[in-house]
């Protein structure tokens, strides 16, 4: 390091006591000479070491100076200042206890950390004719020696062409640039290789054998550069997308046996079955041979239409089939007749509607006193008479299931006259 003037043995004033002084000095903001220079000794600084920001060519009639962390000259970034008259050192909010100010405006930073890297601003106050001050502002950027980087990966075992991977160069280093290398060559930019805004993260969209690596990253700043060890992705073979074959897509409820098969067959895979997005639970009604590739349902209900999926897995992951949904045939259930009124007066309107749960929809027909009236769900008589009294039956039939059902009600029509 260069020759230093010993720091004065003076009183040390907290930064709050400088509020008025700082405002006055900033008010005298006139241009000055640009011959002042700042250099770091040593030029390559490692974390945990000391560095001196050595100032050259200080002007005559120096009144004082202020050091700031960064390029913002405010109290928040204020480290320390020195006032020549009285040899007073003042510390600000950005003072960490590791900075030492010297009378020649140099600043010693001990036990340097990564947070210390970055720009520093020296604000010099110079006396002129004794009635006003002249100030100058000089900025210097401190660069630490770059650490040896390492590469972290979101997935070291991606599926070929199927999975995206992000590679990140660690650690995050201020005021440094990042470079990437693949197969020892500068990284080519293609549609499948993208860099983040800072170049610190590399995105690989669909890894192939040509983009599996090895990869290296480099951290570089004006004083040093360091490159990581190579990282190569373990490219896994692409899993074939499975599909389901089934013996009957239109089973009858509680009657037909269903056989699901997950294709393709391979001894290298394990098979998993899914129903409605949930792993199919173990149940006495569900039969699965040892290999689990075949799923047997001795019967199925209307609540088990699916969707069904099968998944093939290896030690690194799996892939699911497209969903398969059953068209379960059921019903007709016992029909319902609305409204349930049974008493009418002559001349009123009779309107009855019949419904029954059924898939496919059931066929409907009505009989009155065992005489066929008409097909359809609804029965309408505009002017009912006593002749319409009797037993009304709604019959339903599902031709797909071969099942029938019916519901009856008694209607009583009374004669009445206006008194």
From Swiss-Prot:
Record-annotated Ig-like C2-type domain positions: 149-234, 240-327, 335-410
Superkingdom in the source lineage: Eukaryota
Signal peptide (UniProt feature, chain positions): 1-34
Alphabetized UniProt keyword annotations: Disulfide bond, Glycoprotein, Immunoglobulin domain, Repeat, Secreted, Signal
Residue ranges occupied by any Ig-like V-type domain in the UniProt entry: 35-144
Localization annotation: Secreted
GO biological process, one term: female pregnancy
Major localization listed first in the record, in broad terms: secreted
Carbohydrate-modified residues: 61, 104, 111, 199, 259, 268, 303
SUPFAM superfamilies (alphabetical): Immunoglobulin (SSF48726)
InterPro entries given in the database record: CEA_cell_adhesion, Ig-like_dom, Ig-like_dom_sf, Ig-like_fold, Ig_sub, Ig_sub2, Ig_V-set
Any one of the GO CC terms: extracellular region
Cysteine disulfide partners in this protein: 169-217, 262-310, 354-394
Repeat keyword on record: yes
Family membership: Belongs to the immunoglobulin superfamily. CEA family.
Name by which UniProt lists this protein: Pregnancy-specific beta-1-glycoprotein 1
Gene: PSG1
